[in-house]
């Protein structure tokens, strides 16, 4: 079943169904590992991100439940993140290689990739308690499923519409704020916040795709493109931080400086493209979009009653 909630059905049942499905998929993937343990961890963390986004959208009025379950999901994801984060840096080097301008740049990036791969392997060997962490996360997923019994949401369509619109508006306000800060100060944390807001918007468009399939699918494609640009940008920020904290991983100082110059150039390109696209993705005001969501929800619910 898709990551979707239908306005013509009780909101509580829809949210519980999606939440249970994400947690059950995470459990199944971590237990069966069809593509290996590390891919299973990567997939489970995606389940957690989707569920955290769902709670962020619909639980603006139930802060206690949201706070508790958000902490559960955040901690579960973090406990499994070490090796995945190290693997992501290898993928970042591969992205840089695709944008190398000279042979010297290509050689420098290739050498960095080899060193990052060695670092990832060392981390994997050192993380001897990974299986215990996976077992603990599976237990937390089951506890998260049990917690759904305590979830409370409005049953009337107009109240549900207002609640979802409130969450939608809050997300877009955060996106606009992050966008303006990114344009002004341009620091890595602002772009990271913009990425998180864009990712939430992309997932929300999927959640409510039934409201207006053609328009939401077009917006979702633009949002996904923005998420990808900002994802690469953030990965380069993480790689820069590693260069600062563990320069020995990358060899001599001259090589580190050359690699940093390559990173900065690509990061500037990504930021320029992302800001231009973000202006289009978040062109409408949060208030106007929220009003549209509320109206579409009521129309959809009314047409199918």
Give the residues covered by each predicted segment.
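Function-determining surface determinants
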Residues: 1-305
């Amino acid at each position: 079943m898709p990551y979707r909630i239908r306005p013509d059905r009780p909101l509580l049942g829809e949210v519980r169904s999606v939440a249970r499905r994400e947690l059950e998929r995470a459990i199944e993937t971590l237990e069966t590992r069809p593509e290996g343990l590390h891919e299973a961890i990567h997939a489970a963390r995606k389940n957690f991100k989707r569920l955290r986004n769902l709670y962020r959208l619909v639980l603006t009025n139930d802060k206690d439940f949201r706070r508790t379950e958000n902490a559960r999901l955040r901690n579960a994801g973090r406990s499994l993140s070490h090796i995945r984060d190290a693997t992501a840096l290898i993928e970042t080097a591969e992205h840089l290689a695709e944008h190398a301008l000279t042979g010297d740049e290509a050689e420098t990036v290739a050498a960095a990739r080899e060193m990052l791969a060695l670092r990832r392997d060392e981390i994997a060997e050192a993380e001897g308690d990974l299986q215990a962490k996976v077992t603990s996360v599976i237990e937390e997923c089951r506890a998260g499923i049990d917690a759904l019994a305590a979830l409370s949401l409005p049953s009337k369509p107009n109240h549900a519409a207002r609640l979802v619109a409130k969450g939608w508006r809050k997300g877009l306000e955060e996106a606009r704020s992050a966008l303006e800060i990114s344009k002004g100060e341009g620091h890595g944390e602002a772009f990271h916040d913009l990425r998180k807001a864009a990712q939430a918007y992309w997932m929300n468009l999927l959640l409510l795709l039934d409201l207006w399939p053609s328009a939401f699918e077009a917006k979702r494609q633009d949002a996904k493109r923005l998420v990808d640009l900002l994802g690469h940008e953030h990965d380069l920020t993480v790689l820069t931080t590693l260069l600062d904290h563990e320069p020995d991983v990358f060899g001599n100082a001259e090589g580190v400086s050359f690699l940093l110059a390559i990173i900065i150039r690509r990061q500037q390109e990504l930021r320029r493209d992302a800001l231009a696209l973000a202006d289009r993705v978040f062109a409408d005001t949060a208030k106007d979009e929220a009003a549209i969501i509320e109206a579409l929800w009521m129309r959809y619910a009314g047409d199918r009653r």
